[in-house]
């Protein structure tokens, strides 16, 4: 997200917002702290969600409440913990989320790595790439995003289904 030009990306761990200079950061957190949380915010996840445009969760069930979502800026919520997301779609929508996606196939907007891996690997193998670059990942994200025609975009239909026959396999 940072490499694609998104603004102030704030990351959290079990203790809350990760901030440059915090004690106890592991090497990966230390590295990411230098390029994220540009306003040096501190606090818990609830603080990070205030006025946020989006939440991307890959952590644990029932971490986010509809009250937390209600503090977001017309938020986009991707709650991808499986099998139980950080917040259930109906709760996120009740909190005011504009768009909700989960990792589950029984809800709209399934966000699943199966959309990416076959095509990225096929492309990398076809050009004998020695690594998957940021540019390759960005182009894959744009290609997947473009699979839903503008006239078909709705809050419940923002991403192609893993069963879409147009996906490279």
Predicted regions and their residues:
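A broad, structural surface signal
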Residues: 3, 47-50, 66, 70, ...
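Long hydrophobic segments that form regular secondary structure
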Residues: 41-94, 128
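Short acidic, glycine/serine/threonine-rich loops at helix termini
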Residues: 3, 14, 20-25, 67-69, ...
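Structural motif
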Residues: 8-10, 53-56, 75-78, 97-100, ...
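Adenosine-phosphate binding glycine-rich loop
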Residues: 81-169
């Amino acid at each position: 997200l940072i490499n694609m030009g998104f603004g102030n990306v704030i990351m959290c761990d079990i203790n809350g917002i990760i901030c440059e200079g915090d004690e106890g950061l592991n090497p990966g957190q230390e590295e990411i702290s230098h390029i994220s949380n540009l306003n040096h915010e501190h606090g818990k996840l609830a603080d990070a969600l205030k006025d946020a445009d989006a939440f991307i969760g890959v952590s644990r069930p029932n971490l986010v409440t509809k009250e937390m979502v209600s503090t977001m800026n017309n938020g986009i919520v991707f709650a991808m913990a499986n099998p139980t997301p950080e917040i259930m779609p109906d709760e996120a929508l009740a909190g005011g989320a504009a768009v909700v996606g989960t990792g589950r196939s029984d809800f709209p907007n399934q966000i699943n790595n199966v959309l990416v891996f076959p095509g990225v690997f096929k492309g990398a193998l076809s050009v004998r790439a020695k690594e998957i670059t940021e540019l390759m990942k960005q182009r894959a994200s744009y290609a997947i995003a473009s699979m839903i025609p503008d006239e078909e975009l709705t809050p419940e239909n923002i991403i192609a289904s893993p069963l879409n026959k147009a996906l490279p396999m």
